[in-house]
Amino acid sequence: MKTLKFYAIFLILAFIMLGGCKEDQKKIIKTEPITFTKEGELTIYKEQSDSVLVKYNIEIAESDYETQTGLMYRESMELDQGMFFIFPDVLFHSFYMKNTKIPLDLIFIDDKLRIASFKENAQPMDETGLSSEVPVQYVLELNAGQRKQYSLEIGDRIAFIRM
């Protein structure tokens, strides 16, 4: 009788131990990369001559969700692409680079569609605030270096169309 109890206890302990040795199953979550969605085109014109400086395909951020997430979690952006933010009011707008993996130039644009100020070479993942120097209604995010490459200046004009 003692041996039967011994074997019963042994079997119970063996099952408990084997169950406890089960290897943890780690879930692998596959995330899809966020891709660019062309929603319009934007052209920047030189202030004095009205000559075309550069044209971009733009993704438009207009809703609260779109303006809050912007280019977060994106791995890259083509040189002819940008994120164009449209705000309902002319205000001092501030951005930061939280969860943004691409260095950016921020072009702040007033309600008359003129470049009002810049923040150049904003660094990925930096949560320092990047504010416009004057009240603006639009902001264009481009790959870092675009402002210098195309000699964009305060007063240059933009025009955009939605697709």
Task: Tell where the protein language model's regions lie, with residue ranges.
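Compact, glycine-rich, soluble single-domain proteins
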Residues: 22-163
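Bacterial N-terminal signal peptides that target proteins for export
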Residues: 1-8
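C-terminal motif of bacterial Sec signal peptides marking the signal peptidase cleavage site
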Residues: 17-20
